[in-house]
Amino acid sequence: MKIGIIGAMEEEVNFLRDKMENRVATTIANCEFTEGQIGAVQVVLTRCGIGKVNAALATTLLNDRFQPDAIINTGVAGGLNASMAVGDLVISTEVRYHDVDATVFGYEYGQVPGMVPAYLPDATLIAAAKTAAQKVGFHSEEGLIVTGDSFMGEETRVNEVKTLFPAAYCAEMEAGAIAQVCHQFQTPFVIIRALSDVAGQDAKMSYDTFLEKSAVNSAKQVMLMLDHLSA
């Protein structure tokens, strides 16, 4: 089994890279790919850069050049649900865009014309993520993750997104693009995000303080997922 793992920033991938053996690094179009092994699992770890275009580019290259059996996106996000706190984990059961509006043409809000309204992660990967979350001991929830090309630090926009997507647990900047590309390639995927901040509530201060810790929380869950998938 070969698993592709994508993180946007160095803080989101360095913990996993340090755990890899037999590493071989390649850079394509400013996207960093590191092949190697974590335990019994062959891994291609990808640092894609921030935002939807960077994420789509890296996910396309990952699928085309390395052909993984599945893709896991790890990283941090801004929380949208009052029941969750910084450091908690969100496991995707659905991924949508919060910054796409083609409703005038009859599409759902968040739906890219010609594409599905929501991208659904693989059930086996969701189950593995849930098992890993229980083992690692972090509080986790499963549900909707929304994506857009903006940091959710402005209270008015946060409230707009909450109104549009009341079921959303968190917002971030890459998952929707990763999910859309995986949908096109028919590659199973799941998104794992740890909360680095609560969107709109001193979000930047919290993000700066908790980025690395939350990123490691997400990466630790991915490590346990790999153990489960290789069993």
Curated annotation (Swiss-Prot):
UniProt keyword Metal-binding present: no
Annotated pathway: Amino-acid biosynthesis; L-methionine biosynthesis via salvage pathway; S-methyl-5-thio-alpha-D-ribose 1-phosphate from S-methyl-5'-thioadenosine (hydrolase route): step 1/2
Residues annotated as catalytic: E12 (proton acceptor), D197 (proton donor)
CDD domains xrefs: MTAN (cd09008)
SUPFAM superfamilies: Purine and uridine phosphorylases
Keywords from the named record: Amino-acid biosynthesis, Hydrolase, Methionine biosynthesis
Sequence positions that bind substrate: G78, M152, M173, E174
EC annotation from Swiss-Prot or TrEMBL: 3.2.2.9
InterPro entries (alphabetical): MTA_SAH_Nsdase (IPR010049), Nucleoside_phosphorylase_d (IPR000845), Nucleoside_phosphorylase_sf (IPR035994)
MF GO annotations: adenosylhomocysteine nucleosidase activity; methylthioadenosine nucleosidase activity
UniProt record, GO biological process: L-methionine salvage from methylthioadenosine; L-methionine salvage from S-adenosylmethionine; nucleoside catabolic process
A GO CC annotation given for this chain: cytosol
Disulfide-bond pairs as recorded: none
Catalytic activity: S-adenosyl-L-homocysteine + H2O = S-(5-deoxy-D-ribos-5-yl)-L-homocysteine + adenine; S-methyl-5'-thioadenosine + H2O = 5-(methylsulfanyl)-D-ribose + adenine; 5'-deoxyadenosine + H2O = 5-deoxy-D-ribose + adenine
Summary of the function given for this chain in its UniProt record: Catalyzes the irreversible cleavage of the glycosidic bond in both 5'-methylthioadenosine (MTA) and S-adenosylhomocysteine (SAH/AdoHcy) to adenine and the corresponding thioribose, 5'-methylthioribose and S-ribosylhomocysteine, respectively. Also cleaves 5'-deoxyadenosine, a toxic by-product of radical S-adenosylmethionine (SAM) enzymes, into 5-deoxyribose and adenine.
Protein family: Belongs to the PNP/UDP phosphorylase family. MtnN subfamily.
HAMAP family per record: Salvage_MtnN (MF_01684)
Protein name (Swiss-Prot/TrEMBL): 5'-methylthioadenosine/S-adenosylhomocysteine nucleosidase
Organism: Shouchella clausii (strain KSM-K16)
Lineage: Bacteria, Bacillati, Bacillota, Bacilli, Bacillales
